[in-house]
């Protein structure tokens, strides 16, 4: 996609004098122009393969898949629309093999097992080496330094392992016990191809996060009319990476690590008041672990924070649904109420970091 759609925006005009200097007329933000985006092309190519077997004595399903992809993305703006780039871009590729195994009646009757595993190795190259400054008309002037935002030609290697285990044990038709465990391991190493440093991170310090989430649940379904379930989860996350010791959050990085853990739980139930009308009620003491970009940024337009706490929330949901079928036709309606009480909420803001012209999305 060229993404060359129109935007309505003001323009930072400039004039180049005969001596080569640049004059900037007063900026009039009341004048809005209808202009095309000109540096926002994106393309992605992928090769995907999958092979497996089903219906074997030792496996009901075993599948191995492979995914290789390449992408190229031009960067039109910073985190603000009035910061315009004309040559900044990023590119990269990723390799992802994965495995899935499913077996019913494992060792004993009514014990089902699902295992999945995948490995993702991707490389991203952020390039900002132009010595030009652009406006929304695509006009430019030569600057005295390189880098439209921040001079860089950096390479980030991300290695990500993920695995899941899920076991279901059925006792008769009414009772089901489920145990699940999800593990992930992420490591990012970065380097500057041109030998430049970054104000927003330390290339020499690896970024590492490891997550483990274990869950146990019980479901009672004595009839098609109603069911209830209860569950508990344990969360654990280890993070390690560069943390700035400066008051403005820029430079003077040291390698710090932290470990957080939490315990969540909840219950849910459904009940048919009559044949076509169902009510659902659920409550969860939930936790959301920070993502890799929230922890470490994207090495370009986003800055992360290694010492983030998990989001915690009390979630209450109540919904009603009506589903009526008559002949080839059907009527479905649903209404619900949602209550959320969230603490340690992770949000992104916009900031000018380190007193520079570089604006970033920050946690």
Residue map of PLM features:
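Short, intrinsically disordered, charge-balanced linker/junction segments flanking boundaries
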Residues: 1-12, 173-174, 335, 352-363
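Extracytoplasmic loops and strand-loop junctions of Gram-negative outer membrane beta-barrel proteins
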Residues: 27-35, 79-85, 96-97, 143-151, ...
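Face-selective signature of the C-terminal outer-membrane beta-barrel domain
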Residues: 48-71, 90-249, 254-274, 280-284, ...
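Short, solvent-exposed loop/linker segments at the N-terminal edge
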Residues: 207, 309-311
């Amino acid at each position: 996609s060229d993404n060359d759609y129109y935007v309505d925006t003001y323009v930072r005009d400039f004039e180049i004098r005969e001596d080569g200097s640049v004059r900037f007329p007063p900026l009039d933000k009341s004048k809005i122009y209808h202009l095309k985006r000109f540096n926002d092309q994106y393309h992605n190519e992928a090769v995907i393969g999958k092979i497996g077997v089903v219906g074997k004595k030792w496996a009901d399903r075993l599948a191995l898949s492979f995914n290789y992809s390449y992408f190229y993305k031009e960067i039109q703006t910073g985190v603000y629309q009035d910061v315009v780039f004309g040559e900044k871009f990023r590119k990269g590729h990723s390799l992802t093999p994965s495995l899935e195994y499913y077996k019913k009646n494992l060792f004993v009757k009514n014990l089902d097992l699902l295992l999945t595993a995948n490995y993702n190795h991707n490389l991203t190259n952020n390039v900002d080496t132009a010595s030009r400054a652009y406006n929304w008309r695509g006009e430019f002037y030569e600057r005295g330094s390189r880098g439209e935002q921040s001079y860089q030609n950096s390479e980030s290697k991300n290695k990500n392992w993920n695995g899941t285990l899920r076991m279901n044990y059925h006792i008769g038709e009414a009772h089901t016990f489920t145990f699940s465990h999800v593990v992930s391991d992420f490591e990012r190493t970065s380097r500057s191809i041109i030998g430049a440093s970054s104000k927003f991170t330390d290339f020499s310090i690896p970024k590492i996060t490891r997550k483990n989430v274990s869950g146990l649940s019980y479901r009672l379904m004595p009839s098609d009319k109603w069911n209830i379930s209860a569950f508990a989860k344990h969360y654990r996350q280890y993070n390690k990476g560069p943390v700035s010791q400066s008051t403005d959050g820029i430079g003077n990085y040291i390698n710090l690590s932290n470990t957080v853990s939490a315990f969540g739980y909840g219950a849910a139930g459904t009940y048919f008041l009559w044949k076509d009308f169902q009510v659902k009620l659920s409550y969860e003491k939930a936790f959301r672990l920070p993502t890799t970009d929230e922890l470490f940024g994207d090495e370009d337009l986003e800055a992360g924070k290694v010492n983030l706490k998990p989001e915690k929330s009390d979630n209450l949901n109540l919904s009603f649904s009506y589903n009526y079928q008559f002949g080839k036709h059907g009527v479905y309606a649903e209404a619900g109420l949602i209550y959320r009480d969230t603490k340690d909420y992770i949000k992104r803001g916009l900031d000018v970091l380190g007193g520079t012209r570089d604006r970033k999305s920050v946690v």
